[in-house]
Swiss-Prot record:
GO cellular component annotations of the record: large ribosomal subunit
InterPro entries listed in its UniProt record: NA-bd_OB-fold, Rib_uL2_dom2, Ribosomal_uL2, Ribosomal_uL2_bac/org-type, Ribosomal_uL2_C, Ribosomal_uL2_CS, Ribosomal_uL2_dom3, Ribosomal_uL2_RNA-bd_dom
Species name: Mycoplasma mobile (strain ATCC 43663 / 163K / NCTC 11711) (Mesomycoplasma mobile)
Gene Ontology molecular function terms on file: rRNA binding; structural constituent of ribosome; transferase activity
Alphabetized NCBIfam families for the sequence: rplB_bact
Example GO biological process: cytoplasmic translation
Protein name according to UniProt: Large ribosomal subunit protein uL2
Positions with biased composition (Basic residues): 274-283
Assembly behavior: Part of the 50S ribosomal subunit. Forms a bridge to the 30S subunit in the 70S ribosome.
Amino acid sequence: MAIKYFKPTTNGRRNMSSLDYSKNLTGHEPTKSLMTILKKKAGRNNSGQITTRHKGSGEKRKYRLVDFKRQKDNIEAIVKTIEYDPNRSANISLIVYKDGFKSYILYPKGLKVNDVIVSGEDVDIKIGNTLPLKNIPEGTFIHNIEMQPKGGAIIARSAGSSAQILGKDDNGKYVVLRLKSGETRRILAECRATIGVVGNEEHSLVNVGKAGRNRHKGIRPTVRGSAMNPNDHPHGGGEGKQPIGRKSPMTPWGRKALGPKTRKTNKSSTKLIIRGRKKRINN
């Protein structure tokens, strides 16, 4: 999908870019039976307190019901459309099974309209097909990966993401994957995945350009703690541009930041990680 750049007619448009959806999408209206109402919570809980900062309502939109399980085995499906989904960075495709059942799936790179895809235990290694990890050869790039059998995919679902199969363990119970983050981990061999890489990989190259586009997405501004009052943040207060007045940076709730690990120590999946993700190096 090509990137469209704008002329610098205003300050907000000077560095703005967007994806040219006319190059790849089929332009069909979304299927009403596969949409549902999406309620906006704007980061609040049932009592109205902010539980997640920097979240707003954004544009009104409906949620597309995407099939992350792909459990209709050995029934061929035809790809009918390639559509935009406002709720995720990846595009989606409408597929129609031979028995007439319709569903949305994540659009993998290289899939075309009228292509035939299928799910099952021993289906072909072809873009868009879904099968257990134990039946996928080494070196294959996959996406839409489950962590528990029949639990639905939760890994490699965003635009341009994928994982690569490195091998299988000695007893065949686990398959070793290398994720996009650089993390190497084991996944149960019975879990399913889809062949290919998630499409719309140019999504990360888009320059938002102005704050208003983020507000449409439901992203509110991020304010520095040192610009707040002392009753709002541990870094707040002081006359003019003062230091934070602490030995180390603090979170808004008074805990130390930039140091302590934030991952839960009692997660059962931690023991399946062979090598952690690559650390970012700030230049």
